[in-house]
Amino acid sequence: MQNPRTVSDTKRAFYAAHTRPIHSIYRRFIEELLVEIHLLRVNVDFRYSPLFALGVVTAFDQFMEGYQPEGDRDRIFHALCVAEEMNPQQLKEDAASWQQYQGRPLSQILDELNSGQPSAPLNSLNHTGKYSRLHAVGLYAFLQELAGEVTIHLNETLDQLAPVIPLPIEKVKRDLELYRSNLDKINQARSLMKELVEQERKRRAQQTSAPPAVDASSDAPA
């Protein structure tokens, strides 16, 4: 019987697939995501679903926004999926399938869920496997696409969903509060990093364009 993969195995697989260095503010997020997905997938109650896929893709895209060089971002996502033994194309396709609900009112979604036969991928909100923060992120990303501003009063929206989906809504609320707080922090760190890079660029430009200093001693009479 083959021993289950460990967190260390998953990390090694990732760094074997992506050998280029990763900027420090992003590396911590990637390693935390690697661990989170690994621990979820080795759980016997884990069930892959389009909701999980949307959560993974959304979390990655939002936290890795602005990563340079841009081409490395896709390579990092591919390496992450390889390390977790997931199909990156399937994740992206399943995440994109939620776009069919863009602009729909929440009331219509509630009606479909109440019907007992929601269409795919909406039916993955009837999640009965192991819950994780990534399911909450996927739900939040889905709600952001609906008509109106249902995420402004997020807790009220989640309370409306509570009777018709089996997700642990109170955990979802706490996880999303922490998720949005962490996203704000990394956005602030990104902004600061951009400012520092721009300041350094201007400083170097000024040094390059400045005229050479004149040695006053050379003009002194002999």
Curated annotation (Swiss-Prot):
Superkingdom of origin organism: Bacteria
Pfam families to which the protein is assigned, alphabetical: ThylakoidFormat (PF11264)
Biased composition (Low complexity): 209-222
Region (Disordered): 197-222
Disulfide bonds: none
GO cellular component terms listed in the entry, alphabetical order: plasma membrane-derived thylakoid photosystem II
Residues annotated as transmembrane: none
Keywords: Coiled coil
Gene Ontology biological process terms, A to Z: photosystem II assembly
Coiled coil: 169-208
Known role: May be involved in photosynthetic membrane biogenesis.
Family the UniProt entry places it in: Belongs to the THF1 family.
Protein name listed in UniProt: Protein Thf1
